[in-house]
Amino acid sequence: MPKTDIARRVYNHTWKLDPIIRSLLDTDFYKLLMLQMIWQLYPDVDATFSLINRTKTVRLADEIDEQELRDQLDHARGLRFTKKEMIWLAGNSFYGRKQIFAPEFLVWLAKFRLPPYELSRRDGQFELTFRGRWAETTMWEIPALAIINELRSRAAMKGLGPFTLDVLYARAKARMWLKVEQLREHPNLRISDFGTRRRHSFLWQRWCVEALKEGIGPSFTGSSNVLLAMDNDLEAVGTNAHELPMVAAALARNDRELAAAPYKVLQDWNQLYGGNLLIVLPDAFGTAAFLRDAPDWVADWTGFRPDSAPPIEGGEKIIAWWKKMGRDPREKLLIFSDGLDVDTIVKTYCHFEGRVRMSFGWGTNLTNDFAGCAPTEINGLNPISVVCKVSEANGHPAVKLSDNPRKATGDPGEVERYLRFFGSEDFVEQSVRV
């Protein structure tokens, strides 16, 4: 693939629309895995997704032009999966398994298009909402976030000249390569790209993926971005997300169903997938509550992804639970993915080395680390914590607690109800940067 001069491309403003989303495969792999499950098992469920900017000091609607945002969202709505993409999805092996996507699902997917959106402004923030069938609205999460983040990057760089942009990207590349050199010191460490949703830009994420592929070789295990995995002959990686237990809990008709919701979606998942895809995400309503009530069969799954507790603390908690359940942690897998950068990755790897298998999903600090790279300080290049979460399912409010109270989402009254029901044991409040 020919190399792109990113700085020159950013400076060139001659086109009417420079699309941010160029393909429906420009999404995280777990969205497709979850989509197949939703399409098969929850075809009649409605789900609303809402944009949430947790960095309240950044007024997105003041930084991003509303018409540019609408143009990018409209462009994404016009995309379809191409014939080449459908052939690749049907014929490629994922996690060692052929035909992971059912033929009838692929027939439906070939006709898929993103549903309508609702966009307004309030108090300097965008209110961006997607309503409809869960099997349609779920696919907006990643492109919506990628569009918001790249438009913010573009706005921050709009007034920069070509040489300033050259310096900006040269410094960002040098910073990234220093991280690669740190990772080389640990050849048994396994790391993948999880950086799509809050990336600086598509072209920059592509550069980072290509740099990791060359720089750390077999230690780089793949990308969550399906398009980049396809184009770079990499493994598409990813398992499942919080939206599954969030929707299941919102649909619960009584306390018994609410308590069972986190485990019901795992049983649903197990109907479709197995092996290395049996990864538990335990923190939707708090890891302590999940482990306290987890059935014995959960301990037979391949591994866990602790996503909101400090990585060493979260990993130790899960290892202790495996031992309590009579399982050997050395045969299990921990996937760390919450706000990681190289120093945290290396520290966590060295702490657990030899005690458990590990993999690291490197996200925003891989694909959007531009703070201080411009010749003058540009706040718009600093990453923010923006998410797109399920807010309703069949008209019922959806909630996420997490192990970090600052990452909780949902109606405040419902959040309080969930806290009373599941408890808040071992919650650790931490600042949320990304």
Swiss-Prot record:
Pathway: Cofactor biosynthesis; NAD(+) biosynthesis; nicotinate D-ribonucleotide from nicotinate: step 1/1. The keyword Hydrolase does not apply. It comes from the Bacteria. InterPro entries: N/Namide_PRibTrfase, NAPRTase_N, Nic_PRibTrfase, Nic_PRibTrfase-Fam, Nicotinate_pribotase-like_C. Transiently phosphorylated on a His residue during the reaction cycle. Phosphorylation strongly increases the affinity for substrates and increases the rate of nicotinate D-ribonucleotide production. Dephosphorylation regenerates the low-affinity form of the enzyme, leading to product release. One of its GO terms (molecular function) is nicotinate phosphoribosyltransferase activity. One of its GO terms (cellular component) is cytosol. Pfam families: NAPRTase, NAPRTase_N. It catalyses: nicotinate + 5-phospho-alpha-D-ribose 1-diphosphate + ATP + H2O = nicotinate beta-D-ribonucleotide + ADP + phosphate + diphosphate. The modification Phosphohistidine is found at residue 242. Keywords: Ligase, Phosphoprotein, Pyridine nucleotide biosynthesis. Its EC number is 6.3.4.21. The keyword Cell wall biogenesis/degradation does not apply. It is an enzyme of class 6 (ligase). GO terms for biological process: NAD biosynthetic process via the salvage pathway. Belongs to the NAPRTase family. Catalyzes the synthesis of beta-nicotinate D-ribonucleotide from nicotinate and 5-phospho-D-ribose 1-phosphate at the expense of ATP. This is Nicotinate phosphoribosyltransferase. It comes from Sinorhizobium medicae (strain WSM419) (Ensifer medicae). The gene is pncB.
